[in-house]
Amino acid sequence: MAVPSLWPWGACLPVIFLSLGFGLDTVEVCPSLDIRSEVAELRQLENCSVVEGHLQILLMFTATGEDFRGLSFPRLTQVTDYLLLFRVYGLESLRDLFPNLAVIRGTRLFLGYALVIFEMPHLRDVALPALGAVLRGAVRVEKNQELCHLSTIDWGLLQPAPGANHIVGNKLGEECADVCPGVLGAAGEPCAKTTFSGHTDYRCWTSSHCQRVCPCPHGMACTARGECCHTECLGGCSQPEDPRACVACRHLYFQGACLWACPPGTYQYESWRCVTAERCASLHSVPGRASTFGIHQGSCLAQCPSGFTRNSSSIFCHKCEGLCPKECKVGTKTIDSIQAAQDLVGCTHVEGSLILNLRQGYNLEPQLQHSLGLVETITGFLKIKHSFALVSLGFFKNLKLIRGDAMVDGNYTLYVLDNQNLQQLGSWVAAGLTIPVGKIYFAFNPRLCLEHIYRLEEVTGTRGRQNKAEINPRTNGDRAACQTRTLRFVSNVTEADRILLRWERYEPLEARDLLSFIVYYKESPFQNATEHVGPDACGTQSWNLLDVELPLSRTQEPGVTLASLKPWTQYAVFVRAITLTTEEDSPHQGAQSPIVYLRTLPAAPTVPQDVISTSNSSSHLLVRWKPPTQRNGNLTYYLVLWQRLAEDGDLYLNDYCHRGLRLPTSNNDPRFDGEDGDPEAEMESDCCPCQHPPPGQVLPPLEAQEASFQKKFENFLHNAITIPISPWKVTSINKSPQRDSGRHRRAAGPLRLGGNSSDFEIQEDKVPRERAVLSGLRHFTEYRIDIHACNHAAHTVGCSAATFVFARTMPHREADGIPGKVAWEASSKNSVLLRWLEPPDPNGLILKYEIKYRRLGEEATVLCVSRLRYAKFGGVHLALLPPGNYSARVRATSLAGNGSWTDSVAFYILGPEEEDAGGLHVLLTATPVGLTLLIVLAALGFFYGKKRNRTLYASVNPEYFSASDMYVPDEWEVPREQISIIRELGQGSFGMVYEGLARGLEAGEESTPVALKTVNELASPRECIEFLKEASVMKAFKCHHVVRLLGVVSQGQPTLVIMELMTRGDLKSHLRSLRPEAENNPGLPQPALGEMIQMAGEIADGMAYLAANKFVHRDLAARNCMVSQDFTVKIGDFGMTRDVYETDYYRKGGKGLLPVRWMAPESLKDGIFTTHSDVWSFGVVLWEIVTLAEQPYQGLSNEQVLKFVMDGGVLEELEGCPLQLQELMSRCWQPNPRLRPSFTHILDSIQEELRPSFRLLSFYYSPECRGARGSLPTTDAEPDSSPTPRDCSPQNGGPGH
């Protein structure tokens, strides 16, 4: 067998290691890229060598495989953050797209993941053949229904800690043809083998691309020839031990070389490269703005850290003396959230103006103080408006100067307007706030006392600058009701996400008193809203506010557009005029509209949630889902579309006669067993949303991460898919669907599949509830099912984007049956061609056929025929058959398993004499007809007369039967009337085996349960005699661990041999029944180490007894050991009770059947069978016990096993096998027979671990054994010297047999 190379990837990967030099003049560094919608957008990657940031490729619904053909970016070798692929249609592999992508650094991660491949409907393999390292972060590969070759990737070679990877929901491994190069007939040299997650296997990306496994220490990279790269290289190199020939750098890169640290005068940037101070100074966080980059502790940072600052004359960060001055140039910055305020953390000097507009929130002062508490100077103005969440301005605890370089409306340096809950100005008075120029303005602050404002005037030095209208006593600190006028709305226009409002013009007595309007609006399911605009009981603002400036023309009606609204939602709206009164004694004039209720128009719903499926028959699928999170209308029905998927034709390329067949399943989703939740139930609560989780209630980190990841992708859907295509107009993929190409352009694509799926019609149905039953489907076939949610406006807005699931129907029981009869024709000497028709409508694909054929009077042989081999001839050639009469039958194996056997077809192979007679017959046909008839009649008369005289029985001797051939009844004879048959147990090598009762067989027992062996009714006298001679061998055996002969019934028909009843059958069947997936599992646990050693001891004891009696077994295997009711294992009765395990035997050169997988090399080479060769077989039996009766040398044909063992090969070491058993097997498989232990020596090594009962019952502890020690056969005996009388048994044949 070929030995895999440690670095086979160099021979089979089309990797072009570019000699880029890594200088900035040759390496193109690209920023983060978000490529979506159009395949042409991928051209942005054309010259990129490194993506400094993330690379996202997503939402290409109209792309096809042709669009990606020829598209390749071989220059790209590194992504510094993460790589994400999401819903890119038509892309089948990343192999050509990124052939040289070697490193994903994971500097910044996507929810903890460095590589994300999510819902890629046509991706068949990942295939990043050059990928050598994912430095940080996990891998998430999920919901890719065609994605295979995941089981052959060793993620441990790429990641330091692959345990957090999340790889679920992809194509079932059983349905994939995951074969690596050089394995099971695949082209190329074998890939390297590694162990990952407890599984040792060949490692590859595809069937033609191995995964790189470098033979270098400490995870070093290597060249294509397997030579070790420099220690600073990562992902490979073009020359060994050269830091300038690396594909990527392990640490840092500068001017074409990979380095451990940046050289003097350069600084680390983005964790992977070095830049000069000049280069760092030229970088910009925000294009168009002055650079804020600084150098600190050898790194080029986007901003100096806390406690450090930089000045205009130096790029280096310096430690502050005292309070760290930090100048922040902001222009005019609006702070409308805590997040926006965090941009000013650490700022002491704000160059620009601040506008505070904090409308929602609870207890914000501590958080605002963290962000704004160090501000001492504002060079422009400070405007605080509509900040209902503010109670105090104390968070500006260090504010000393508002300089007024810029002013509100050219007049006001401090402008405080409409803050309904503002009560305190904080420490401004104590701190001595100075406003050197401009006025202050306070209006509509009903809770702010005037005395605070007047005191501020004195401290800031602004008293006398402003008039009474600018600090109006009627709108500050005064909760008294004002005289107001009613405003009327004159028009409103609603859309799905906006409302356009207009109201009548309002003119107060003094036109200059009207400042602006404020529109208040909020969701209001019921028409019970009040005009209270302060914070609600939870501390948050219930109304949304929108400032409306006065129209430029006095004749124009004011209006506004409320945007970003929810579809099909009722809103409460009112408008209020903001006025002031210039005359102190005049009444307050104001205006306000009544509350009106408006509903937005419907829109397409979001996608249905949590779709699951199951199959309850071969023609039905059941699908269930949950309603969409946003219905955007009255949900009226769901549109369900389904299409049959073509089976993967690549499965035909595998020879399943040699490769293990793992079948796809159609198991029910366990969630179907749960009770249905009420999809209409809505969460209702009269309480405020909690700011912190209740004590003791902690969301598990994994669940929290799962929920966060799912939410992130839902955001993708909502942000990128504006309105879905109207799928309800699609009836067949062969028709031309009429779709709106305008506003629906960027929607999620309709159901469209790759491969031959387009040959199958798309079907649809409308269902009113969250479930559907799909009927009339093809058996054992995979379907894609799309579910769209549709509301009452679907005829205008369309239905939702699709959520989809893949499901497979159950198999049809009779679909894999072969129609008609099997035909045959002679093709050449000793050869026939068997032909049959394929099943017309199988369960999925037909993968192989099995032919069971037998020569009359011999055991059956099973031949496996791959689908490709069948396709060449429409059948199979059976060659090198000995002359005789044969029968054969055939069955097919599909994706669903085995079909039924056909009826037997009879055929014959002519012998040499018959062929000569046939030639003579041809010659005689040329003679006159009369002569021909005369000769034929004479011959018939002659043979008829001979037949009447006597019947011939073939014998090797001239006499028909010698005295030694006859069976003579003795003391073992049991009268037939004492025997009664109860039931059939199975087929033995001579005939049927029954369970029965024998009366008077044992003293003190009225009846004894026994096993009864019979010969077939058509057996010849010779076969009956051989049957009785097999039984006679056991008359001399009396050992607890050898199955006992109890008697013989030789008088009359049928001949019976009475044996000890072993109720649990043979050891092979018993072990297989203990597998967890076994259908006949008796509910027993798998055997522990002590039980395995007990089985081994009992078998060794029985074999030690046979060896002491000079008996060589020749066919020791689990199938020939029997298990009693109390689980004692005994050596079987030497071929008589063996079940017909045809595949365990091999016919070598037309001779008898040989158990080659259990035979020692000397037996295979020279036909030598000794106790030593039995010890070899015992080692294989140990291997069977550990593996629960797997087939030895699985994956190799009998011919390959024959050559492998004769060339010195042995079975591989088992993963997780106890060391004691593994060492014992190794001793049994010594190439030199004399170095193998005897069975008594084997018992010596394990006697301490055997049960106490073993000492009482075993041969090993008997006086006979002690006397027999030293006289065991140790020389290589020729087969004919063995005392066994079974000279004609094919298992015992030596040379010449």
From Swiss-Prot:
Record topology, Extracellular segments: 747-921
Q: What class of enzyme is it?
A: transferase
**Entry keywords, A to Z:** ATP-binding, Cleavage on pair of basic residues, Disulfide bond, Glycoprotein, Kinase, Membrane, Nucleotide-binding, Phosphoprotein, Receptor, Repeat, Signal, Transferase, Transmembrane, Transmembrane helix, Tyrosine-protein kinase
- Bias type Acidic residues, positions: 675-685
Q: List the glycosylation sites.
A: 47, 311, 411, 492, 528, 616, 634, 756, 885, 898
Q: Name one Pfam family in it.
A: PK_Tyr_Ser-Thr
The known PTMs are summarized as:
Autophosphorylated on tyrosine residues between pH 7.9 and pH 10.5.
Any GO BP: cellular response to alkaline pH
Biased composition annotated in UniProt, kind: Polar residues? 1281-1297
* Positions of modified residues (Phosphotyrosine): 1145-1146
**Which cysteine pairs make disulfide bonds?**
214-222, 216-228, 229-237, 233-246, 249-258, 262-274, 280-300, 304-317, 320-324, 657-864
What GO molecular function annotations does the UniProt record carry, in alphabetical order? ATP binding; insulin receptor activity; insulin receptor substrate binding; phosphatidylinositol 3-kinase binding; transmembrane receptor protein tyrosine kinase activity
Cellular component terms per the entry's GO annotation: axon; insulin receptor complex; plasma membrane; receptor complex
Q: Does the keyword Amino-acid biosynthesis apply?
A: no
Q: Where is the active site?
A: 1115 (proton acceptor)
Q: Does the keyword Transferase apply?
A: yes
Q: What is its EC number?
A: 2.7.10.1
Annotated signal sequence range: 1-26
Where does it localize?
Membrane
Note the InterPro entries from the entry.
FN3_dom, FN3_sf, Furin-like_Cys-rich_dom, Furin_repeat, Growth_fac_rcpt_cys_sf, Ig-like_fold, Kinase-like_dom_sf, Prot_kinase_dom
Q: Where do the Protein kinase domain residues begin and end?
A: 979-1254
The record's function comment reads:
Receptor with tyrosine-protein kinase activity. Functions as a pH sensing receptor which is activated by increased extracellular pH. Activates an intracellular signaling pathway that involves IRS1 and AKT1/PKB.
Family of the protein in this entry: Belongs to the protein kinase superfamily. Tyr protein kinase family. Insulin receptor subfamily.
Q: How does it assemble?
A: Probable tetramer of 2 alpha and 2 beta chains linked by disulfide bonds. The alpha chains contribute to the formation of the ligand-binding domain, while the beta chains carry the kinase domain.
User: What name does the UniProt record give this protein?
Assistant: Insulin receptor-related protein
